[in-house]
A protein has these predicted regions:
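Charged, amphipathic alpha-helical segments and their flanking helix caps
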Residues: 1-30, 44-134
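A short, hydrophobic beta-strand-centered structural micro-motif
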Residues: 34-45
Length: 134
């Protein structure tokens, strides 16, 4: 599995949860995101390789889910953050169902304290390591 296949798999999973998908380095986020809810994938980083012609690769993944956040009550903000956390858990669980994905390790999810763009969105950010066959 290549990083392109992994990104496409994450695109399909995020789209299945009704998120508009975007992928580029984080500095492009303010100019690229034009609709919400949005999923932003930082290009996966190849962290480790085991084997020469076939074996395992470990990719570090950063996936952000964003929703409109202007004028939300504290209760509504907390509810939406909880929804996004559950969605991220679902996406990474579904990712392991692909036959080329061995496992997802070191998954951490945290709410962001400030907006990525000037739209005033709220977001949850997930980082994980995906171990895949090649």
């Amino acid at each position: 599995m290549t990083r392109v296949h992994l990104a496409q798999l994450l695109r399909d999973l995020a789209s299945a949860h009704d998120y508009a998908f975007f992928s580029a380095p984080d500095e492009y986020m303010p100019s690229e995101i034009d609709r919400y809810p949005a999923a932003w994938l930082t290009p996966p980083c190849l962290k480790e390789v085991e084997g020469r012609r076939h074996g395992k690769r470990t990719y570090e993944i950063q996936l952000h889910l964003l929703q409109p956040g202007m004028r939300l009550t504290h209760a509504e903000r907390a509810r939406r953050l909880d929804e996004m956390e559950q969605t991220l858990l679902g996406i990474f669980t579904e990712l392991t169902e692909d036959p080329k994905v061995i496992c997802v390790e070191r998954l951490s999810i945290r709410p962001r304290t400030c907006a990525f763009t000037n739209h005033g969105e709220i977001s949850q950010s997930a980082t994980a390591e995906a171990v895949v066959w090649f």
